[in-house]
Each structure stands twice: as structure tokens, then as C-alpha cells.
């Protein structure tokens, strides 16, 4: 019998009404495995709890309890919210939060949501087995962004006795070699789902979210963006890596390894279809076309001329970035100049300015704030003609282009933030909607 993994995100569980929709789907389809995120907004509240003063933590705890109690009240089922949230009480006495404490605290969101969904399904006559994520997702010792130990997970999986037809599992969390709780990183519930799929040799992963699949561009930016019926793993990887928020980038690797297709659809309107993501033979030559666009605003661009450092300059700069804990969104090196993009939401401007001070000790460094990273995803985009065509189009916007970076499936460039949406709209109208060849 084929196995299917369903994953429901936080927006799918945000209200009692939404949870009822989720449980309708589960009880009707009876998927082999169900992975759930925390209820929308709960993880953010738990992060706030960790960063707050002792006095403020009491207020955050009340908000966390209140959010869950309102949902339980509207579901009209018995559910012990206070029993779950009592796990936070010891942290009202101790200000310092270690990385292990952080992982334990944030895991509460998924622990509650999995238990709640299971309880609702039970009232409808479908008893889900509980598969504890900490006993399945086995990782290294990083508490906040752990890496799965796949060999260990596979060995352990074969020892499990899975006798029930359907199981629910918490997303986002796992455990290390000492059995301590760890996190897979924000967005990690998608990763949990595909890891379970790989272990179970599933035939499909179905991601339920608040949109009907993957779009040619964020509909909040381009109102007439179109749903994409299908994408290759590589195309989706590029989209996810360069700003598309629908899927968490690492979650693709288990499905790529095992050849398991992913279907992205809406919890609220599943009959309208979605987007398939699967392996596609890219050895065939395709004409240069843009399939989708992504936009990352609130970025900064740094260029470093390391000519004076000689042949070891790039390695030295990379070492400085690593020592400052900076993982650029995009990096390109050419002619003794390296340029990289930093996300202002992740790396504060204060941290960026400090980095520039360090880099300037041995190189000529320039930092540009208020820029945007635009990426085009498609086929055969690495030809000089494509870059020439796009460069010519950008000249019409009379603003600087800070850098280009290209591969056969992705072409990225950095522009001033105020120009970005106009550029995106023109590229979408001229190439994506028309399915036009970029360069002839």
C-alpha cells in the first residue's frame, strides 16, 4: 500500500474553523502520516517569551494560553491547555535562556498543535497514532538549526513498530544524541515532512498552505500572477533560495534523493488544484524563457575590492564573513572584487557597518543599503544574449544595477529598492505572462 505524507502549516491551523477543515481532510483522506506546524503566531510568541524580561514573560505566557484556549473553546472539546503551557512556568523564575532552553520552549507550539489535531480527529471517529518527532528526527548537537543524521534515522526507523494506518507527528523538532530537544530552523516543518517521506518511502508529499500552489510571482506584488502547474526540483530550489516563501529550501533534498513528488495546494480550496514539484529531465535543450520571478526587499549590497590582498584575498574575506556569522543571500566574485547581498531582517545594519569596518582594514569596501534582490527562474538563462537583453531593459529604469549572477536556471541582479516592483512588473508582463523567449 502506497504511503502519503500530508503537512499542514500554521495558517491552516490558525482558528478553530481552520482546524476543522484540516481534520475534515485528514479523516476523509486518511494519509499515512500527518505533520503539523504550530498554530499561526505561536512560535513568534514563544520567541518573544525567550527574549522578554521575567515580568514580561508572564504577559506573553497569558497570550500563548489565551490563543490556544480561544481555539479550544470554539472547538468545544476538552483539552488541557494549561497542562501544556505549564512547561513554561520554570522560565518565569530564571532570566537566562540557553540554546537548549530555547529549543525546549519553541517545541511547545508543535507539541500542542499535534495533540490538538489528534484530539479533534478522534472526536470524528479517526484515531491517529502519535509518532514522537524526537524519536524519529535524529540530528547533530545544534539546538537551533540542527542537521538530520540520515543514516541513524534510517537504522532507527526500521526498528519502529508502526501498526496503525495513520500517524501524526510534530514538525520542526527532533532530538540529538543525548535525547535533548532540537529545532530544524524556522520553516523546518516542511523539512520534517519530507524526511518522514524519505524514511517511509512515500509516494507523495502534500503541502497544505494558504495558497493554491506556487505562483509566477508573489500575488501581493503582482496581482495577476499565475499559478504554475509544475516545477522541477531545481527550479523550486532556486525559487525558495532566492526569496519565495512557500517552501523551506532544505525540505527539497529528501524528495530529490528519493524521487518523491511534492504537491503544494490550499487547505481552504484544494479542489482548485496546486503545483507539482518533481524530477524533470533537464538534459533536453530549452529556449531561454522565464518561468517565475522572486523579489527580496530590505537587502544591503557590499562590494569588496581585495586587489591589495593578492591571490589569498577571497579566502580571507570568506573567513571574515564566517567569523561574523554572515551567510550572504547571494555572492559573486570577479576580477579581485567580491560582491554579496545581506538580508536586513537577519543581519542588522549595525552588524553590517561593523563588518565593513573590519573589511576596510585590508580592502576597498562599499556598502549600499535599501537594495532589492530580483531573481528570474527559467530555462537556458546563462547565455550572454539573455544578460544583454535584460541589461538593456534595465537601462530604461535609470538606476544602478549593482551586480549580476547567473546560471542556466537562474539569473539574479541587485537594484535600488524603489525600482524593484516596477522592474518586476515589466519582466512579468513581457516574459512570464507572454511565455516569450528572452533572447533570440
From Swiss-Prot:
UniProt GO cellular component terms: cytosol
Domain of life of the source: Bacteria
Alphabetical keyword list: Amino-acid biosynthesis, ATP-binding, Diaminopimelate biosynthesis, Kinase, Lysine biosynthesis, Nucleotide-binding, Transferase
InterPro entries reported for this sequence: AceGlu_kinase-like_sf, Asp/Glu/Uridylate_kinase, Asp_kin_monofn, Asp_kinase, AsparK_Bifunc_asparK/hSer_DH, Aspartate_kinase_CS
Class of this enzyme: transferase
GO-annotated molecular function: aspartate kinase activity; ATP binding
Family from the record: Belongs to the aspartokinase family.
Gene coding for it: lysC
Pathway(s) the chain acts in: Amino-acid biosynthesis; L-lysine biosynthesis via DAP pathway; (S)-tetrahydrodipicolinate from L-aspartate: step 1/4; Amino-acid biosynthesis; L-methionine biosynthesis via de novo pathway; L-homoserine from L-aspartate: step 1/3; Amino-acid biosynthesis; L-threonine biosynthesis; L-threonine from L-aspartate: step 1/5
UniProt organism field: Chlamydia pneumoniae
Catalytic activity from the UniProt record: L-aspartate + ATP = 4-phospho-L-aspartate + ADP
Protein name according to UniProt: Aspartokinase
The enzyme's E.C. designation: 2.7.2.4
UniProt record, GO biological process: diaminopimelate biosynthetic process; homoserine biosynthetic process; lysine biosynthetic process via diaminopimelate; threonine biosynthetic process
Amino acid at each position: 500500500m502506497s504511503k502519503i505524507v500530508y503537512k499542514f502549516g500554521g495558517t491552516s491551523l490558525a482558528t478553530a474553523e481552520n482546524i476543522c477543515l484540516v481534520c475534515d481532510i485528514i479523516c476523509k483522506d486518511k494519509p499515512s502520516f500527518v505533520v503539523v506546524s504550530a498554530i499561526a503566531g505561536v512560535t513568534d510568541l514563544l520567541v518573544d517569551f525567550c527574549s522578554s524580561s521575567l515580568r514580561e514573560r508572564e504577559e506573553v505566557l497569558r497570550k500563548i494560553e489565551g490563543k490556544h484556549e480561544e481555539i479550544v473553546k470554539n472547538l468545544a472539546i476538552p483539552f488541557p491547555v494549561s497542562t501544556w503551557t505549564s512547561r513554561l512556568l520554570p522560565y518565569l523564575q530564571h532570566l537566562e535562556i540557553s540554546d537548549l532552553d530555547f529549543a525546549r520552549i519553541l517545541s511547545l507550539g508543535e507539541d500542542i498543535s499535534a495533540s490538538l489535531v489528534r484530539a479533534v480527529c478522534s472526536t470524528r471517529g479517526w484515531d491517529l497514532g502519535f509518532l514522537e518527532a524526537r524519536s524519529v528526527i535524529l540530528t547533530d548537537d545544534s539546538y537551533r538549526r540542527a542537521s538530520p543524521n540520515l543514516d541513524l534515522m534510517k537504522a532507527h526507523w526500521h526498528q519502529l513498530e508502526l501498526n496503525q494506518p495513520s500517524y501524526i507527528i510534530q514538525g520542526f523538532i527532533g532530538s540529538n544524541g543525548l535525547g535533548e530537544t532540537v529545532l530544524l530552523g524556522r520553516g523546518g516543518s516542511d523539512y520534517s515532512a519530507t524526511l518522514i517521506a524519505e524514511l517511509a518511502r512515500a509516494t507523495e508529499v502534500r503541502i497544505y498552505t494558504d495558497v493554491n500552489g506556487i505562483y509566477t510571482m508573489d500575488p501581493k506584488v503582482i496581482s495577476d500572477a499565475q499559478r504554475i502547474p509544475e516545477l522541477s526540483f531545481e527550479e523550486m530550489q532556486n525559487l525558495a533560495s532566492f526569496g519565495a516563501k512557500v517552501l523551506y529550501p532544505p525540505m527539497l533534498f529528501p524528495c530529490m534523493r528519493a524521487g518523491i513528488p511534492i504537491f503544494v495546494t490550499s487547505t481552504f480550496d484544494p479542489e482548485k488544484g496546486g503545483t507539482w514539484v518533481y524530477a524533470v529531465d533537464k538534459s533536453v535543450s530549452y529556449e531561454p524563457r522565464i518561468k517565475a520571478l522572486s523579489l527580496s526587499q530590505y537587502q544591503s549590497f557590499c562590494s569588496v575590492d581585495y586587489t591589495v590582498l593578492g591571490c589569498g584575498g577571497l579566502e580571507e574575506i570568506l573567513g571574515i564573513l564566517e567569523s561574523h556569522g554572515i551567510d550572504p543571500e547571494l555572492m559573486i566574485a570577479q576580477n579581485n572584487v567580491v560582491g554579496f547581498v545581506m538580508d536586513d531582517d537577519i543581519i542588522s545594519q549595525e552588524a553590517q557597518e561593523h563588518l565593513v569596518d573590519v573589511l576596510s582594514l585590508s580592502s576597498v569596501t562599499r556598502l549600499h543599503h535599501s537594495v532589492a534582490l530580483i531573481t528570474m527562474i527559467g530555462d537556458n538563462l546563462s547565455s550572454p544574449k539573455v544578460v544583454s537583453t535584460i541589461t538593456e531593459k534595465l537601462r530604461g529604469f535609470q538606476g544602478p544595477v549593482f551586480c549580476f549572477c547567473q546560471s542556466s536556471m537562474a539569473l539574479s541582479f541587485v537594484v535600488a529598492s524603489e525600482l524593484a516592483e516596477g522592474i518586476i512588473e515589466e519582466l512579468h508582463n513581457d516574459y512570464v505572462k507572454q511565455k516569450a523567449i528572452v533572447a533570440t
